[in-house]
């Protein structure tokens, strides 16, 4: 049973990622990993809030390491935590760029950030630094094509 359960989880996670990357007009697959949450519910709420944020989706499409948009999404998550302890990194196959420490932006190379965010698979890593609970959520960017597809759609 344990082996089947683990295999099923892997298959379901892969299917979730495939669905997320197949969004209308999508150009990037986004994976948000939250760690250090005080509890599982908080980790899930924060990860989903980030991945659902239109501003975060637009920033990733624009290859803009706008950590403020990510913190904004974290801030409007209905969860109890201290925003002044939050760290944010952006990652892809081209590397990692640290953009926020202790709830504030830190100096980083815009060139490196653009290089990291030019990839099709982007990882948004958030550490709340307030516990041990983790969560992941998947989504896609918000592109011009998404607006065109949905703006032209008639029911």
What residues fall within each predicted segment?
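A glycine- and small/hydrophobic-rich beta-loop-beta segment
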Residues: 1-62
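Internal helix-turn-beta structural module
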Residues: 36, 44-48, 52-155
């Amino acid at each position: 049973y344990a082996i089947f359960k683990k295999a099923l989880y892997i298959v379901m996670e892969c299917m979730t990622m495939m669905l997320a990357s197949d969004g209308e007009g999508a150009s990037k697959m986004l994976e948000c990993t939250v760690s250090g949450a005080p509890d599982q519910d908080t980790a899930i709420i924060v990860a989903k809030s980030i991945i659902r944020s239109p501003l975060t989706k637009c920033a990733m499409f624009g290859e803009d390491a706008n950590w403020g948009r990510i913190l904004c999404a974290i801030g409007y998550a209905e969860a109890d935590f201290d925003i002044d302890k939050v760290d944010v990194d952006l990652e892809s196959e081209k590397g990692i760029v640290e953009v926020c420490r202790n709830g504030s932006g830190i100096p980083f190379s815009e060139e490196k950030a653009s290089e990291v965010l030019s990839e099709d698979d982007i990882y948004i890593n958030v550490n709340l630094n307030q516990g041990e609970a983790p969560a992941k959520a998947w989504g896609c960017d918000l592109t011009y094509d998404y607006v065109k597809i949905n703006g032209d759609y008639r029911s």
